[in-house]
């Protein structure tokens, strides 16, 4: 046998199997694969349909978009009688409204129940006409027209309902800081009278970064 034949025979020789054998896939492995596939489908679904002003979603804490920061407004609703309403326009600080052409990407509402909270409230953000006086009748009509997605927040024995946030994406609308006065937070006290010491609302407006002062206030 010449050298070439010897080499060919070596190549054709079957590789010796490794010692031992791999165990059959366990049920845990199969469950993990199914879970991974479900998470993959969920991620694709979320990526395809990001929340908009008409389709908000509950979210956990999120980082601001690159190049953006946020300004928070704290609202303490006054006493609201049972089946009555409250509305407050989004009024940002002067130091922010000075840059009224900076774009706004998202608005988030966070509901913070105080220890005495034992009610059910509906909360939303609506773009309202400048002529609207946010009267009870006007707010009632906006809740009733079905055009406003609503966060229903109810008393929870643990103190905080699992879903206490509502996010609106305004990116597609090219809204800016100057437009924020056209938006208002609306509250409906459904089952009980809401007292002044029961609830605090935090509104986070995510907008393009603005210059910050390097001088301490006098």
Swiss-Prot record:
It holds the Pfam family Cucumo_coat. One of its GO terms (molecular function) is structural molecule activity. Gene3D superfamilies: Cucumovirus coat protein, subunit A (2.60.120.530). The keyword NAD does not apply. It is found in: Virion. Residues 11-21 have a biased composition (Basic residues). Residues 1-28 are annotated as: Disordered. GO terms for cellular component: ribonucleoprotein complex; T=3 icosahedral viral capsid; viral nucleocapsid. The keyword Acetylation applies. The modification N-acetylmethionine is found at residue 1. Keywords: Acetylation, Capsid protein, Ribonucleoprotein, RNA-binding, T=3 icosahedral capsid protein, Viral nucleoprotein, Virion. InterPro entries: Cucumovirus_coat, Cucumovirus_coat_Asu_sf. It comes from the Viruses. Its main location: virion. Belongs to the cucumovirus capsid protein family. Capsid protein. Probably binds RNA and plays a role in packaging. The N-terminal arginine-rich stretch does not seem to be the major RNA-binding region that allows formation of an infectious ribonucleoprotein complex. This is Capsid protein. It comes from Cucumber mosaic virus (strain Pepo) (CMV).
